[in-house]
């Protein structure tokens, strides 16, 4: 049975009975692992468990509180989720590094049972998440909801209905350009976003299969620009 684990940083609000929390990082596992995570966290040297019950663990790390629960945090009335554009302080670099270090520790200990990591806006496979956090992570991604355009050097020409996605070779895929024959940029953007999400959600050794699927579904060809190879995807 699949299980989702929600990981969030808590920040007490002195003028309100509710505690502020970050948007959740969601880990999806193939099996029920909450009891296993409980044991793993007891071995996490950087933190100390201060609350432990059936559905939620509160961990203290460097004087910060982290909630790990197998229930959607929205169901807890004592918490108030802070959107990215509401309060930048809760998403500051120190808090971010605490969160991501903990998440990577949990992933490292559970690589065989974890399926996906949902980083608020987009799902990633375990392999792609580890690459992202190790090489591409920047604190500004937590504050700016358009972080994907920086990570993947997304370039666009709305007047021509063209959008390109780069640096995917780091994720075991080919960089690609979507161009609309009718210069419909919105349609090109939707196709680009769907493909990018799928790439980041790919498991090991599935890249070639997905590439073949794209080439069957769309009119495609390859180009080389300054020794850089792109897959061009033509849509109406």
From Swiss-Prot:
This is Uncharacterized protein UU139. It comes from Ureaplasma parvum serovar 3 (strain ATCC 700970).
């Amino acid at each position: 049975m699949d299980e989702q684990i929600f990981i969030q940083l808590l920040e007490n609000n002195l003028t309100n009975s509710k505690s502020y929390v970050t948007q959740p990082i969601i880990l999806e596992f193939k099996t029920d692992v909450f009891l296993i995570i409980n044991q793993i966290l007891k071995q996490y040297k950087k933190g100390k468990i201060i609350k432990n019950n059936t559905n939620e663990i509160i961990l203290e790390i460097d004087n910060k509180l982290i909630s790990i629960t197998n229930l959607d945090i929205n169901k807890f009335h004592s918490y108030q989720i802070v959107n990215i554009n509401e309060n930048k302080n809760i998403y500051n670099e120190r808090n971010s590094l605490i969160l991501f270090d903990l998440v990577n520790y949990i992933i490292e200990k559970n690589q065989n049972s974890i399926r996906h990591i949902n980083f608020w806006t987009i799902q990633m496979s375990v392999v792609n998440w580890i690459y992202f956090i190790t090489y591409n992570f920047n604190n500004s991604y937590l504050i700016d909801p358009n972080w994907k355009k920086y990570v993947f050097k997304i370039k666009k020409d709305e007047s021509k209905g063209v959008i390109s996605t780069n640096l995917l070779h780091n994720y075991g895929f080919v960089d690609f350009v979507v161009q609309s024959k009718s210069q419909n940029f919105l349609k090109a953007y939707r196709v680009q976003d769907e493909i990018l999400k799928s790439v980041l959600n790919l498991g090991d050794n599935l890249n070639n299969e997905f590439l073949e699927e794209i080439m069957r579904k769309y009119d495609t060809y390859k180009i080389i620009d300054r020794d850089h190879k792109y897959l061009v995807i033509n849509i109406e």
